[in-house]
Structure formats: C-alpha cells, structure tokens
C-alpha cells in the first residue's frame, strides 16, 4: 500500500475519535454514578487510540518527506541543466507575454498527486487569469492540461475550452525525446497564435516562482519582426540553404516549444517535491506537538483515575475499621 493510501486510512481511523466534546473526567461524580462497571478507564483508552493514530500518521509523513527529498535530488540537477536549452531562445526572440493575438493556448502544468502545498492552485489561478485577460469578441483561449490536479479544477468551469488532457506524465523519469514527442502532438492538435506555458520555477525547497513562458507561432513572429522591436533583429540574419524564412521560423517554433516544455516539466516536478517535503515536515512537527499534548492529557487522566481508586480503597478500609 502506498504512503498516501496509508495516510488516508489513518485519517479515517482517527476521524471518529475526534469530537467537539471534552474527554470526560473520571472525577465527575455524575458520570461515575451513571457509568457501567469498567467505564472509568474509557478516557485513557480513547487517548491511547488517538496517540496510536497520531504516531502512525507521523511515521507516514516522515517517510513521505524522505521519499520527496530523494526524488528532488534526482530531478534538481536535470532541471538546472535544462535551463540552458530555452535561454538562447529568450536571447534571440525575447519574451513577449503581452503580445496581442487572437488564438491563445494556455498549457497548464501541474502534478498528478496532492499533499504538495498550493503549487497546483497557483498554476490554475494564473491560467484562469490568462483566460480572462485574453478574452474578447474576436479572441479565444483554449487549455492544454498536464496533471490530474489542474484537470480537476479547470474542468469545473472551463470544460468546453479544454483541448487536451495529459495525466501520469511523471510516472516514469522523463527525457527530452519523450517531451518533444508530446510537444509535437500538442502542436498538431491545437491552433494557436501564442502558447502560454504555466509552471512553477524551482528556487529552493521552500520557494518556487509561478512562471509564464510564451511561444509565438511563425506567423506572429513574422508580424512582430516587421513591427520592429526585439524580433526585428531577425531580419539581420542571413538564411543559408534552400529553406525559406517561413520554414525556418516553423522549425524554430517547434524546437523552442519542446525545449521550454522540457524545462517547465522538470522545474514543476522540482517545485512539487520541494513543496511536498515542506508540507510533510510541517505535518510531522504538528503531529509531534499533538502527541505531546495527548501524552500530557493521558498522564493526567491516568493519574486522576489512580487517585480516585486510592480514595475508594482508603474510604472502604476506614469504613471497615471504624
């Protein structure tokens, strides 16, 4: 059974034991008069059950933290190395997130599993914001979703605008070839003027930066080049061979998209594992604090029960000798 399944099981086990009523004190006379024989030890039994469940949950969260740390170390170096793939495109084409186009495709990258803080909610929030920002009578925004968590949120209010849904992307370690095939499939199945890739850029275990990378279609690149600016510098390059400018821009757009996607997937995976490490560490500390409070409650309850029994024994002995 996976760690997440075990955590859910312990949560269900602990849920019936958590209630708004305080644990009855064994010193309460009314409860002692009305309770059946042996009911005086029920308070300590409830606390012991809670302590057992909290200990089990703490073991699971610590194990999940260690697993996330191991996965993060495996991905982090690859993510840092992949940054060199898309940076030349930024130097050549610039980053034009504010370019005005009619057909926008938002590629939202999320995780398939939860318990990783708010990275998925952040990506979905930005994706919805891009949809509203690029809305208009002559404009349309479509979504390409990577990951179960973004799918579950975006499908509620944007189902008709979702073009492609891809899940279990992180099930096996990804390489550039696999991501480039995925990028080609996306380009073949959507019509776009601009692709907006939404992901979380890894900075540290406790920090990630929500990021939007823009990839323009060859037609929009030509239009922006004619208008001047950063893309206007493309006209200064000489074209060698028999390829036309349109063909070169088409190949450039496809290669740029696959490089940006590869980096985005790895960066988001790093952010996911870092956020999961942080969340599980916080959960483990909270479980430890709860365990300390339950231990104190258990000792007090047990001491009160023993004191009550001693009082009864002494009272009975006094009655016999009196």
Give the residues covered by each predicted segment.
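C-terminal beta-strand-loop-alpha-helix "lid" module of Rossmann-like NAD(P)-dependent dehydrogenases
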Residues: 2-322
């Amino acid at each position: 059974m996976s760690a997440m399944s075990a955590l859910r099981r312990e949560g269900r086990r602990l849920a019936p034991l958590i209630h708004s009523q305080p644990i009855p004190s064994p010193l309460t006379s009314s409860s002692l008069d009305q309770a059946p024989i042996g009911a005086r030890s029920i308070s300590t039994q409830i606390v012991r059950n809670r302590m057992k469940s909290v200990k089990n949950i703490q073991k699971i969260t610590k194990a999940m933290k260690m697993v996330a740390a191991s996965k993060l170390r495996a991905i982090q170096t690859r993510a840092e190395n992949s940054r060199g793939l898309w940076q030349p495109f930024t130097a050549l084409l610039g980053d034009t997130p504010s370019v005005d186009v009619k057909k926008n495709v938002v590629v939202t990258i999320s995780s398939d599993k939860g318990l990783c803080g708010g990275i998925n909610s952040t990506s979905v929030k930005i994706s919805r914001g891009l949809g509203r920002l690029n809305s208009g009578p002559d404009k349309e925004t479509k979504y390409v979703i990577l990951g179960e968590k973004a799918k579950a949120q975006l499908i509620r209010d944007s189902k008709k605008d979702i073009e492609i849904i891809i899940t279990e992307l992180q099930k096996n370690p990804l390489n550039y070839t696999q991501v480039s095939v995925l990028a080609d499939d996306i380009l073949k199945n959507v019509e776009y003027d601009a692709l907006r890739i939404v992901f979380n850029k890894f900075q540290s275990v406790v920090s990630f930066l929500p990021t939007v990378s823009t990839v323009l279609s060859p037609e929009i690149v030509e239009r922006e080049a004619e208008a001047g600016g950063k893309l206007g510098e493309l006209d200064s390059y000489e074209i060698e061979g028999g390829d036309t400018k349109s063909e070169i821009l088409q190949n450039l757009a496809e290669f740029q998209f696959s490089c940006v996607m590869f980096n985005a997937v790895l960066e988001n995976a790093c952010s996911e594992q870092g956020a999961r490490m942080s969340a599980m560490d916080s959960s483990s500390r909270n479980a430890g604090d709860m365990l300390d409070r339950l231990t104190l409650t258990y000792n007090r309850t047990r001491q009160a029960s023993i004191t009550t029994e001693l009082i009864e024994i002494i009272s009975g002995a006094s009655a016999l000798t009196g």
